From Swiss-Prot:
Tissue specificity: Expressed by the venom gland.
Organism expressing this protein natively: Gloydius blomhoffii
Protein's name according to its UniProt entry: Snaclec mamushigin subunit beta
PROSITE patterns xrefs: C_TYPE_LECTIN_1, C_TYPE_LECTIN_2
Location (main, coarse): secreted
Known function: Binds to platelet GPIbalpha (GP1BA) and enhances platelet aggregation at low-shear stress. At high-shear stress, blocks platelet aggregation in a dose-dependent manner.
Length: 146
């Protein structure tokens, strides 16, 4: 009986010490502020990258940023693996929903845009965002909530 109590107490201590420390993320993912992140050194188009992320884990998508601290965390993950490179992030203008108008205030009625939509990539060195054709291939950072 004493062994059982000791073992039960030991398991309780391990469980309590692991809760809230990223234990809810799979071992190959990194935890930050209730989310799990993973860098994939696989170059693919933006659309394929988003699809790839959704196939990795339920509710996983290309990374989104909601604070400068989160940006710093992701840069600290991507830099050692990818060095000077770009990664796709979860921003795009695929549906071209921006309202564009001329400097004289008239709306755009003739469209001569290249049909390629623009997606957003982030530099791994400082996370500056750049608009890139969605057909370009870059590495991937996926994110999901723990």
């Amino acid at each position: 009986m004493g062994r059982f109590i000791f073992l039960s107490f030991g398991l309780l201590v391990v469980f309590v010490s692991l809760s809230g420390t990223g234990a809810d993320c799979p071992s190959d993912w990194s935890s930050y502020e209730g989310h799990c992140y993973r860098v994939f050194q696989k170059e693919m188009t933006w659309e394929d990258a988003e699809k790839f992320c959704t196939q990795q884990r339920k509710e996983s998508h290309l990374v989104s940023f909601h604070s400068s601290e989160e940006v710093d965390f992701v840069v600290s993950m991507t830099w050692p693996i990818l060095k000077y490179d770009f990664v796709w992030i979860g921003l795009n203008n695929i549906w071209n929903e921006c309202m564009v108008e001329w400097t004289d205030g008239t709306r755009l009625s003739h469209n001569a845009w290249i049909t390629e939509s623009e997606c957003i990539a982030a530099k791994t060195t400082d996370n500056q965002w750049l608009s890139r054709p969605c057909s370009r291939t870059y590495n991937v950072v996926c994110k999901f909530q723990e």
